[in-house]
């Protein structure tokens, strides 16, 4: 989306992508959710003492 609309602000891109995400079925979302879980587990294994500190 950003490549197709190089002058579009990031906030607008985020809004549009969020709207698209809400339109997806659970089955369409599943691969992304599973991949996020896999990355989370990998990160926890590699950095067991990591604590998010903004």
UniProtKB/Swiss-Prot annotation:
Annotated DNA-binding ranges come to: 1-54
Subcellular location, record wording = Nucleus
Which Pfam family is one of this chain's hits? HMG_box
Q: What is its main location?
A: nucleus
Q: Where is the signal peptide?
A: none
| Family matches, as SUPFAM superfamilies | HMG-box
The GO molecular function terms of this record are: DNA binding
Q: Which InterPro entries match?
A: HMG_box_dom, HMG_box_dom_sf, SRY-related_HMG-box_TF-like
For this UniProt record, give its keywords in alphabetical order, as a comma-separated list.
DNA-binding, Nucleus
Gene Ontology CC annotation, any one: nucleus
The entry's protein name is SRY-related protein CH1
């Amino acid at each position: 989306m950003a490549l197709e609309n190089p002058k579009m602000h990031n906030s607008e891109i985020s809004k549009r992508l969020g709207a698209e995400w809400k339109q997806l079925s659970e089955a369409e979302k599943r691969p992304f959710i599973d991949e996020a879980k896999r990355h989370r587990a990998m990160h926890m294994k590699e950095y067991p003492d990591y604590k998010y500190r903004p």
